[in-house]
C-alpha cells in the first residue's frame, strides 16, 4: 500500500509522520522531520477570510515551524553555520505527511519564507511561511489595459501570468464573460481579487499541491467524507447564524459605459533632444482609459510621435525631434464611466454588497439571490476539533455525524488549522452546504 487513505487517518492506532523540505538554494536542501530538527508545526488554510458576510477577503495559507537550533545551525547571523547567507525571505518549503504503513508521502502545501527568527544562544528557530498567493496579494498591481467582454478564465490566466504563475485551476462551471475587466483602480491585489471573487461567486485559494484554485461557491460538489465520533470528532462549537446580523440584502450594480472623448494626459513643457526620446511611463489623469483617440505635440520645432503604448492607467511613447527643444504633450481618449444602481430590499440591517465586477442586472440578480438565500437559511457555522485527515481539502463537502452532540451537519470546509506536536490534530470550520444553494 503506497497511499495514505481516509481509513488510515481515521485509525486510532495510526502513527503519522510529517516532513518538510527546505530549499535553501537550487543545490542545498534540508529534510526536516520529527527525528531531525522538527519541534512542532502548524498549517492554517482558508478559502476566504471568514466574516459576517458570505463573501470575504482572499487570503493565503500559513505555515509556522519551530526548529531545534542545534549549535546555532538555523541562526541567520551565525557566520560559522552551514546555512549562513542562505537563510532569507522567499526560501521554498514543501510540506508532506503520511501514515506509518505507507511509503509515499502526501503533499501538504508549498510555502515561501517571510520571517525567520533565531535568537543568539537560543535553542529553537521560528519560521513563518505562506503559499504563493501571499506573493500575489503583496505584489504590485498589474497595469493592464481594460479587457472588453473577456472570458473569466482567460482573464485569470493573464493576471496570474503577470506573477509568473502559469498553473492555475479554474472551476469549469464559472462560465462568465466580463463586460469590462480591469485592475487599475485598485490599491492592492487583495482588494482586486476579493472584489473580483464577489462577481465570480467564487473562492480563490491554494490546494495541497501548491496550485492556485478558483472554485465556484455554488457549483455542485460530491460528498467527500463523513466524520463521526468513532473516527475523527473530538469536540465542536456552533456560531450564531448570519440571519441574526442582517434582515435584508442590498446589491449595487455598477454598469460600465464608454465616455465621450476627453483629455487623458496633459504635459505643458517636456524637454526633448535630437532623435528618439522615450517618455517613460506617465500616469493618466483620467482612469481607467478605454482608448487613445489622438496625441498632440507642440513646440518651436516639429516633434512627432513615433509609437505609443497605453494601459488603463499608464501611457508611454517615443517622440522624435530634429533638434533640442521643449514640447507639450496632450493625449485624448475615452474612459470607462460607471453608472450605479441598487437592487434588493433595504431593511433596518441590510447586508450591502458592492463590487466593481457586478456590471449588469443579470449578475446583480444572481448575487442578490445567492446572498438572500444565504441570509434566510438560518444555518450555523460549525467549528469542529478533529484528529485530522490531511486528505481533506478546502472546498470539500463533508458530513459531521455525532450522536454525542446530537447533530448531523453537511458542510463545506472553508478553514482548516492543522497542528503537529509529535502527533496531528485539526480544527475545521464549516459553512452549511444547504446555504450555498448548489446547482
What residue ranges belong to the model's regions?
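Acidic, low-complexity/disordered segments
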Residues: 1-8, 127-129, 136-145, 219-234, ...
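Assembly/oligomerization scaffold segments
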Residues: 1-146, 158, 162, 181-184, ...
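Surface-exposed, non-catalytic interaction/assembly patches
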Residues: 2, 36-45, 137-150, 186-199, ...
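Envelope-exposed proteins and targeting segments
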Residues: 61, 109, 123-125, 210, ...
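Solvent-exposed, acidic/flexible segments
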Residues: 86-88, 106, 145-153, 185-190, ...
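Short, well-structured beta-strand/strand-turn elements
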Residues: 119, 164-173, 198-213, 304
Amino acid at each position: 500500500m503506497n497511499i495514505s487513505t481516509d481509513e488510515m487517518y481515521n485509525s486510532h492506532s495510526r502513527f503519522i509522520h510529517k516532513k518538510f523540505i527546505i530549499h535553501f538554494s537550487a543545490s542545498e536542501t534540508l529534510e526536516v522531520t520529527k527525528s531531525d530538527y522538527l519541534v512542532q508545526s502548524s498549517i492554517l488554510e482558508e478559502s476566504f477570510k471568514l466574516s459576517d458576510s458570505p463573501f470575504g477577503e482572499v487570503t493565503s495559507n500559513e505555515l509556522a515551524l519551530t526548529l531545534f537550533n542545534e549549535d546555532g545551525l538555523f541562526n541567520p547571523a551565525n557566520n560559522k553555520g552551514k546555512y549562513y547567507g542562505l537563510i532569507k525571505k522567499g526560501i521554498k518549503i514543501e510540506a508532506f505527511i503520511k501514515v506509518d504503513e505507507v511509503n509515499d508521502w502526501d503533499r501538504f502545501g508549498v510555502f515561501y519564507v517571510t520571517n525567520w527568527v533565531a535568537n543568539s544562544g537560543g535553542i529553537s528557530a521560528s519560521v513563518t511561511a505562506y503559499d504563493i498567493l501571499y506573493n500575489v496579494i503583496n505584489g504590485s498591481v498589474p497595469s493592464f489595459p481594460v479587457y472588453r467582454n473577456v472570458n473569466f478564465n482567460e482573464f485569470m490566466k493573464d493576471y496570474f501570468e503577470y506573477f509568473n504563475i502559469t498553473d492555475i485551476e479554474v472551476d469549469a462551471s464559472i462560465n462568465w464573460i466580463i463586460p469590462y475587466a480591469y485592475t487599475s483602480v485598485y490599491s492592492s491585489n487583495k482588494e482586486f481579487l476579493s472584489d473580483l471573487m464577489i462577481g465570480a461567486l467564487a473562492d480563490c485559494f491554494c490546494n495541497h499541491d501548491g496550485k492556485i484554485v478558483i472554485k465556484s461557491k455554488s457549483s455542485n460538489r460530491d460528498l467527500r467524507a463523513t466524520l463521526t465520533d468513532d473516527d475523527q470528532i473530538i469536540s465542536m462549537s456552533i456560531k450564531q447564524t448570519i440571519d441574526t446580523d442582517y434582515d435584508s440584502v442590498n446589491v449595487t450594480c455598477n454598469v460600465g459605459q464608454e465616455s465621450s472623448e476627453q483629455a487623458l494626459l496633459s504635459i505643458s513643457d517636456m524637454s526633448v533632444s535630437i532623435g528618439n526620446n522615450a517618455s517613460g511611463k506617465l500616469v493618466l489623469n483620467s482612469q481607467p482609459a478605454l482608448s487613445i483617440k489622438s496625441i498632440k505635440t507642440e513646440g518651436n520645432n516639429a516633434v512627432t510621435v513615433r509609437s505609443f503604448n497605453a494601459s488603463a492607467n499608464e501611457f508611454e511613447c517615443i517622440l522624435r525631434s530634429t533638434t533640442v527643444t521643449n514640447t507639450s504633450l496632450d493625449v485624448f481618449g475615452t474612459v470607462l464611466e460607471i453608472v450605479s444602481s441598487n437592487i434588493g430590499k433595504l431593511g433596518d440591517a441590510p447586508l450591502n454588497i458592492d463590487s466593481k465586477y457586478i456590471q449588469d442586472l443579470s449578475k446583480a440578480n444572481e448575487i442578490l439571490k445567492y446572498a438572500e438565500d444565504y441570509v434566510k437559511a438560518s444555518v450555523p457555522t460549525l467549528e469542529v476539533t478533529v484528529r485530522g485527515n490531511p486528505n481533506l481539502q478546502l472546498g470539500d463537502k463533508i458530513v459531521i455525524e455525532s450522536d454525542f452532540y446530537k447533530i448531523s451537519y453537511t458542510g463545506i470546509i472553508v478553514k482548516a488549522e492543522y497542528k503537529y506536536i509529535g502527533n496531528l490534530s485539526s480544527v475545521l470550520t464549516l459553512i452549511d452546504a444547504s446555504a450555498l444553494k448548489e446547482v
